[in-house]
Amino acid sequence: MFGFRLFILAAVALAYIQCAAARMTVAHRLGARSLPTPENDPFYTPDDGWESAAPGTILKKREITVANSGVFQYGVRGFQLLYRTSGVNRGDASHTVTTVIIPENYDKDKLVSANMYEDSYSSNCAPSYSMRKGSKVFNDLANSYQMLFITTLLHEGWAVTVPDHEGPNNAFTSGRVEGHAILDGIRATLNYKKLGLNSDAKVIGYGYSGGALATGWAASLHSQYAHELNVAGWSMGGTVSNVTEWLGYIDNTTGAGFALASLGGLSSSYSELAWVQDNLTSKGRRLLDQSAQNCMYQNLWAVGKQKILDDSVFAGGSTFLQNDGALNILNKLTLGRFSKFVPIAPVFMFHATHDEVVPFNMAITTADAWCAQGAQIKFLSNTGSEMEHTNTELFNLPNVIFFMRDRFKGKDFGGQCQYPSSNDPWFNPQILGTSAAIYLQQVLDLIGNRIGGHDSILWDKVHSKQQP
């Protein structure tokens, strides 16, 4: 079984590389020009007076060509919306961009918010940049991989909105900022009349790892901040639900780059943590400046196994997690800590018990807290020794799709608090078969295959006597 999995993954990777080589050669011969990065693109700057607009208001819009890795043009329509959102607090005016992807024959009653794990302190890694044709080739490998899953959502006939949930300050791990950005991105997408989406369309949000952190906060803030949205469910895996615990866990490991990006994001979002950047050493300034130019994998490679919470990086670094002022902020970023911030739509969580990047106990503690507070939670534990952070996302993609289909169809969720376990999702023949079909389709999409529900959406509506 494990050898067969490796064979499938190797075949997909080989096809991806071959497609990439062909597309990159063509792009080079045509002299393709790179797009301006967000900090040099005036689209990302709102016009004067934007602060008075309501959250979710569209400030600018444009049509774009959607591509993976800057060169693989997808057979879809793409739009970008600059919209008003909120910062840490409801009254803090902010703005960000969402990329809306429309497949062929899409269902106007359904919308998915795909909340990518950007996990960086660089605006160059914003999905809205990396998802455009002409962006720097293979600018963000994490983004390139996640776009493969997005095409799977599009083939279901669902419109997808992809928010830059870190916002203009690259607020990685600033959960409330990211949650607001996701909810307002959904609002903006539904407000864009050109798409024709119904104002009460069912919405599902999904995120993994750092994207799960953002999704968890969107789920938590939904009832208080954007209760009018018709959210059918939330799905998240490898969830960073306790930033305080996570920073201590990943520091001085191969994931130390996450700690550095988190410090940058938190200190740029919270005035109470601005002292971190004010007290950087020369080494710390060099590391953070470098991080501001690097996407996730580049940052991990550059900073791996270094101690970031250390006085050699910033004064007070070694006692940062004991600092009362820092803890006052960090503890507010723990999912499940506050009873007023509880998901009101069903939540599907999944996590590997041997996750080496995000501790399992952190996520299940949040699930337990939400259940105790009345939320509907299904928490799937993957117990196989081979299940780790990266492959847990990959192997659970069919489970995420099944959850979304059921939620959109209005099926019974099956109970308030559910705690199933699975050794390895691929031991399930249905999961294995679905996975193989998904990976094959993703390769076809890279070479320009039309993406969407094709005629299936129309026929479903005709058979159910709905207006096509």
Curated annotation (Swiss-Prot):
One of its GO terms (molecular function) is triacylglycerol lipase activity. The keyword Nucleotide-binding does not apply. Residues 1-22 form the signal peptide. Glycans are attached at residues 242, 252, 279. Its main location: secreted. GO terms for cellular component: extracellular region. PANTHER family: LIPASE 5 (PTHR34853:SF1), PTHR34853. Secreted lipase that hydrolyzes acylglycerol lipids such as triacylglycerols and consequently releases free fatty acid. Due to an absence of fatty acid synthase genes in Malassezia species, secretory lipases are essential for the yeast to generate free fatty acids from degradation of sebum and assimilate them as lipid sources for growth. Plays important roles not only in lipid metabolism but also in the immune response of host cells and pathogenesis. This is Secreted triacylglycerol lipase LIP2. It comes from Malassezia furfur (Pityriasis versicolor infection agent). The gene is LIP2.
